[in-house]
Amino acid sequence: LTYDEIQSKGGSTGYDNAVALPAGGR
């Protein structure tokens, strides 16, 4: 994912979501 794609999923930071999304998409 790109940073923008990660952010669009509602996360606080790109790094947090790069980890969280594969783990369960929180």
Curated annotation (Swiss-Prot):
Subcellular location(s) per record: Plastid, Chloroplast thylakoid membrane
Superkingdom assignment: Eukaryota
Family, similarity comment: Belongs to the PsbO family.
GO CC annotations, alphabetized: chloroplast thylakoid membrane; photosystem II
Alphabetical keyword list: Chloroplast, Manganese, Membrane, Photosynthesis, Photosystem II, Plastid, Stress response, Thylakoid
Function summary: Stabilizes the manganese cluster which is the primary site of water splitting.
Induction data: By water stress.
Other remarks in the entry: On the 2D-gel the determined pI of this protein (spot N146) is: 5.3, its MW is: 29 kDa.
Thylakoid keyword on record: yes
GO BP annotations listed: photosynthesis
The keyword Plastid appears for this protein: yes
UniProt name for this protein: Oxygen-evolving enhancer protein 1
Origin species: Pinus pinaster (Maritime pine)
Region ranges (Disordered): 1-26
UniProt main location, coarse: plastid
